[in-house]
Regions:
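Short coil/turn motifs at secondary-structure junctions
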Residues: 63-65, 115-117, 163, 230-232
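Short glycine/serine- and small hydrophobic-enriched flexible loop segments
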Residues: 7, 95-102, 180-187
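Fold-independent oxyanion-binding glycine-rich loops
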Residues: 41-42, 60-62, 114, 138-141, ...
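N-terminal helical capping/dimerization or prosegment-like subdomains
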Residues: 1-57, 65, 220-227, 237-241
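Active-site metal-coordination/substrate-binding segment of hydrolases
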Residues: 53-112, 130
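Metal-dependent amide/peptide-bond hydrolase catalytic core
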Residues: 10, 14-20, 36-38, 154-246
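Acidic/histidine-rich catalytic neighborhood of metal-dependent amide-processing enzymes
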Residues: 91-155
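Short beta-strand/turn micro-motifs at beta-sheet edges
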Residues: 68-69, 144-148, 210-215
Length: 246
């Protein structure tokens, strides 16, 4: 199994705490013969091979979700945070470019981007800085196929507030109203997906959390709503629909 993969997965790097992993990867690329390896202004790890006029960007992300997992190999399977999402693809990029080496007319740029699991700050910086001829994004969609696109992710907080009422009152609580709103959102999404056979074309909805409380004067309830958007639904369209439902 690749030393790059094992070494990279061994560097615990949840979003916002990637620096140690970034420094490790920069040194790893240097040792593999990259012409340049450095940390860019956004904190991304960058390795450059070749100086040709045609540029290929191989972009992965070096951060992970939180929750450290002991790194171990069992029966040819590597366990550890980020082994799949997405240090596996990133390590493949690093080793593949090192194996290919310098090619006449080409420049390969491998980037381990930061903050992907948050606001994609690393990738946003890359999008502004580079204008490559080709870009390949490393994500866990199996080794034997190529994904042509990914859904966008849209998050929203739906907040319900109302005056405090006596607990024996028939008035609905803020929490009850929030539940009604959630059921209406689900009903809309179910109707939208009814004739969509491909998952890629569907709206994928999740209730990421719900909080409620009161201060003696006012009740409040918050729905934390997540959605994976198909191509035909822009973030603006989705947020407008949510506001309409509310």
């Amino acid at each position: 199994m690749s030393d790059t993969l094992i070494g990279l997965v061994s560097q615990y790097s949840p979003s916002g705490e990637e620096r140690r992993a970034v420094e490790w990867l920069v040194e790893r690329m240097k040792s593999l013969g990259y012409g340049e390896s450095f940390i860019d202004e956004a904190g991304n790890a960058v390795g450059v091979m070749g100086k040709g006029s045609k540029q290929v960007i191989l972009l992965g992300h070096i951060d992970t979700v939180s929750g450290e997992i002991s790194v171990r190999e069992e029966n040819g399977i590597l366990y550890g945070r980020g082994a799949v999402d997405a240090k596996g693809p990133l390590a493949c990029f690093v080793d593949a470019v090192a194996s290919v080496g310098v090619q006449d007319g080409w420049q390969f740029v491998v980037i381990g981007a930061v903050e992907e699991e948050r606001n994609s700050e690393g990738a946003r910086f890359v999008a502004q800085k580079y204008k490559p001829d080709f870009a390949i994004i490393g994500e866990p969609n199996r080794w034997d196929r190529i994904a042509l696109g990914y859904k966008g992710s849209a998050w929203a907080n739906v907040i319900v507030k109302r005056e405090q009422a006596h607990t024996a009152s028939r008035e609905e609580t803020a929490a009850e109203i929030a539940v009604d709103v959630w059921l209406k959102i689900k009903a809309y999404v179910s109707e939208f997906n009814e004739d969509k056979k491909r998952v890629f074309d569907q709206l994928l909805l999740t209730l990421r959390g719900m909080d409620s409380g009161q201060d003696g004067f006012e009740q409040s309830a918050t729905l934390k709503v997540g959605a994976r958007l198909p191509v035909e639904v822009s973030p603006e369209d989705w947020y407008q629909k949510l506001e309409g439902i509310v």
